[in-house]
Amino acid sequence: MRCNIWHIKGQEFDLLIDTGMGLSSLKKYILEETSKPIKAIVTHSHFDHCGSLHEFNCRLGHKNEEEILEKTLNDKIVFSGAWKEIEIIDKKQFPEYSGEKYTVTPAPLTGYLDEGDVIDLGSRAFNILHLPGHSPGSIGLLDLKSKELFSGDALYDGELLDNLYHSDPKLYEKTLSRIINLDINIFHGGHFPSFGKNRAKEIINNYFSGQNKIKDVKLWFNKSKGMSKDIFSDQNWDSSIKLISQNEI
């Protein structure tokens, strides 16, 4: 579950969009990159996006995700029983560690983000979009000037997921219908490489035709074990945006 972690540099403070699984200290890594205050934003509350959120003093997200973030994540979120191994952990160095022991530290939000909010970094600004369906409080960050959307798991270049315990397929269909009609040139998803508008339309249309859905989460999880490392990790889009690979930290 290699979540994309985006570090966006600003004039007075930096943004961190999602925080990965929390297998090692993300904050330690970030402090080597910047001395500015960090506003950590979680696009939604799933374990692979909020694992290191607790390390940061400023934790922002949608109020509909708050209840989950306040608790140690349970097996509904981490798919206990489906995931036995964490590939990034060296079994020889840490023989006692297993996926079944994995937990996420509670990280209560210190502030809320919702539709219409704007985060101004000085050099650029992001409009918050509420994109429910994958989860109740999924959000995206849209730069209207550059026409880039950081979409979390509302849209990524892979099989889409709408059947978790708190997913809502009907809302998800509305979200995807909305996204496909937005004026966006580049999509930075919660997983996999970034992509353009034509690919976004293809992904969404395939979803609506039933060809691009994860129908059984645990089966998909087991099938995904042992997949090769993401060759697209550590992407740099410009001087102010860096994609941090989970394999680095």
Residue ranges of model-derived segments:
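Accessory terminal helices/loops
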Residues: 173-249
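Residue-level signal for the nucleotide or nucleotide-sugar donor/cofactor binding architecture
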Residues: 51, 126, 167
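Active-site-proximal segments of metal-dependent phosphoesterases and phosphodiesterases across multiple
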Residues: 154-166
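Core dinuclear metal-dependent hydrolase active-site scaffold
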Residues: 112-143
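Active-site environment of divalent metal-dependent phosphoester hydrolases
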Residues: 22-25, 45-51, 66, 135-138, ...
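Active-site neighborhood of phospho(di)ester-bond hydrolases with catalytic His/Asp-centered motifs
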Residues: 16-19, 38-48, 59-63, 130-133, ...
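Active-site HxH/HxHxD metal-binding segment of metal-dependent hydrolases
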Residues: 23-114, 118, 207-216, 220
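Conserved beta-strand hairpin/beta-sheet module of binuclear metal-dependent hydrolase folds
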Residues: 1-32, 140-156
